[in-house]
Structure formats: structure tokens, C-alpha cells
Amino acid sequence: MKNNYTSLKSPLDEEDELKTDHEIDLEKGLLPEYNSEEEGTLPLYSDISKLANPVPEDSSTGPTEIANPNVERRQEFKDSHPNIYFLLRLLISVLAVSVVFFTAWVCVNPLEKSIFGKVAFSVTIGITCPILFIATFCFFETWTQAVAQCIKVTVIFLAQCVKVTVIFLAQCVKVTAVFLAKCVKVIAVGLYNSKKDLVVTIWLAWVVICFILFGCVKDGRLNLNKALICSTCSISAALFFILLLVCIPIWTLKHMLFGLFQVLGVQSCVVIVTKGLMYLFDKHIDATGYEIEASSLFVIGNFLFFYEMERPGALKRMPKFIGNGIASFLGGLGNAFGGIGNAIGRIGNAFRGANDNNDIPLGEMDVESEV
């Protein structure tokens, strides 16, 4: 019987099998060249993978840890200079033991006569110092690494604390500055809207302060020169400046400063005139002179302040006003003296006419009477 077996594979499946026979495994790389003569020398894929990855991998330990450069430098120094490294360990250990010994000696020395002091000193010398020396010398690398790590962590922590503190303080300063600016703005607007009440309140406070200072001067508890400066120039100038700054809009700052300097100039002139008069008439300056000077400055300061507040720009117009007043006064004096002169001339003419009438003869008087 003939075998009528027919393959169930389609032509497409056969083509796929032919293709897969010649495909390359990308993970294992290219296949090595096959030599038919030396068929037994064909390397395996495992050998090829070992050649491609020469670094051995230990699945139990995982990837190798990165070495610490400080540890490597220390190991190199230890290998290259063993004697110096040994002396360094010994020196540091001796220094640590010496510090503990002298600390114990200073602390226990006052208690040397007592049993507790002797026992503590003996324990420190006999047990603590040897243990500390052995631990420091034998475990030098361990505790130095721990100390270095602790110092590093501490420095990083302190740096972070300083950074956070600086940022926090900057934020606090910013918030405080903004808050104060808003408060000043609100207060300034409120004071400007109620400047009449503010003027009266501060003027009353000013009067009370000046009277208190005058009372201290009179009572002898305050120096006259200090009282004069505090009660007149400083207080009047400061209050005048503050009140003008608050009560007058900011665009009149030039006018405010000009008025302030005018007030100070007037007060300086009063001081100079008062000093000159006191020097001319009384060389021995006593408390009465200071009281007169302080009272004059106080009255002038109040007058100029209220005059400026009621009529802004009055101080600027004051020189012209004073000049016009002086001119009017002198013109009035001139007119007065002219009127007095005219009156005197008329009186003289009247007397002259009376004298002329007395010189007429009697005959002429009879003729005139007949006519």
C-alpha cells in the first residue's frame, strides 16, 4: 500500500521555519563563524557571554558598593606610612587619656580627703583611663569614621538650620515691614482726615510738656540750658515738622520745610535779640532771663504754628506781609507827621493873621465902619 500521508503544514509555515533557521539571537549576539574542518572547536554561547561581560556578578551580594574616597586615602596613607600612622594613633589615644585624667584630677582634687574622692580618682585612673586608651587605640578607624560622620551630619544640619532661620527672618522682616507700612498709611490717612482734632490734641500735649519743663526749671530740678533747648527749639521744631507732615498733603513738602526753617529762623532771631539785650543791660544772666526767652519762643512757636495751619502758605507770604506792614506803618507815620506839620502851619497862619489885624490904624477902622 502506498503511504498517502500529507503534511498539515502550509507553505507559509514552511517559509517561517526556513527563516527562523537563519535568524540571529539579538541577546546572544552574532553566531561565530563555523569552520567545517574544525567542527569541535566551535565556542558555546555561554563562553561568548562571558567574554562579552568580563566583570563577574555575584547574585547573592548584588552590585558592588562604591568605595569611599576618604577611606581609600586613609588606607593608602596607612599602607605607605605605617610608622607615622601608628604614632598618630598613639598620640591621639594619649591625648584623650590625658584630657580625661586632668579633668578627673581637677574635679576630684577638692574631694581628695574624702573616701568618695579617693574612690572616684582610683576608678578613673585604674579603670577608665586604660579602657579609654585601648578603645581609642584599637578602634581608631571605627571611632574616627563615626566622629567624621557625626561632624558631617552636624554641619549639614546646622547649615540647614541657618538657611531655614535666615529665610524665616527674611519673611518676618518682609511681613513686618508691609504691616508697618500699611499701619502708617492708615494712621496718616486717619490723622489727615481729622487734622483739626489732631492739632488741638497735640497742641494741648505741647502746652503740658512745656509747662512741666518750666515747672522743673522753676523748682531747680532741671538745668536751665537743657530746659531751654528741650522746651523751645527741639519740641517746637519737632512737633511743627510732624504736624505739618501729617496734616498737609505730601506735595507741599517743600512748603513744609520752608515753613519749618522760617520758624527756626524767627526763634533764632528772638534768641539772639534776647541774648543781646540781656548782655547789654544785665551781664549776669539769671533764671528770669531764661524764663523770658523760653516764654517768648513758646508764644512765637504756637502763634506761627496755628497761623500756618489755619492759612497754609502764610509763612511763605510772611516776609512780604511784614514788608508791606512796615511800609504801611512808615507811610502812616509819614502821613501823621505831615498832618501834624499841616496843623502846625495852620496854627501859625492863624497867629500871623491875628497879629496883622492888631497892626491896622484907628482912622482906617472908622472909615471901614462908616462904609
From Swiss-Prot:
Compartments, record wording: Spore membrane; Vacuole membrane
One Gene Ontology biological process: meiotic drive
UniProt membrane topology term: Multi-pass membrane protein
Lineage top rank: taxon: Eukaryota
Segments crossing the lipid bilayer: 86-106, 120-140, 153-173, 197-217, 233-253, 257-277, 287-307, 321-341
Assigned keywords, A-Z: Membrane, Transmembrane, Transmembrane helix, Vacuole
InterPro entries, sorted: WTF
A GO cellular-component term linked to this record: vacuolar membrane
Main localization (coarse): membrane
Function: Acts as a suppressor component of the dual wtf meiotic drive system, and can suppress but not confer meiotic drive by compatible poisons. Wtf meiotic drive systems promote unequal transmission of alleles from the parental zygote to progeny spores by encoding a poison and an antidote from the same locus; the poison is trans-acting and forms toxic aggregates in all spores within an ascus, wherease the antidote is spore-specific and targets aggregates for degradation by the vacuole.
Family membership noted in the UniProt record: Belongs to the WTF family.
Assembly, per entry: Homomer. Interacts with other proteins that exhibit high sequence similarity.
Name of the protein this chain belongs to: Meiotic drive suppressor wtf18
Native organism: Schizosaccharomyces kambucha
Lineage summary: Eukaryota, Fungi, Dikarya, Ascomycota, Taphrinomycotina
